[in-house]
Amino acid sequence: MTTRWEHKVLTYKLGWKAFDYAQIERDLTVLGGEGWEAVGTLAPSFGAGQAIEIAVIAKRPVGD
């Protein structure tokens, strides 16, 4: 039997000087308690600039 997955993407905007990593950690802790697992990140940047947004991709098995 093949495992079916559901996915979630969390996005975070760059703050005044940095990303709020403490908030990201809190969010991941809550999601982990709900069965979500972070499986990837995206930090797109345009040109020579710094990424202004990051995304965390999570998945968890879908219950039948």
Give, region by region, the residue ranges found by the protein language model:
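Terminus-proximal functional modules
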Residues: 1-64
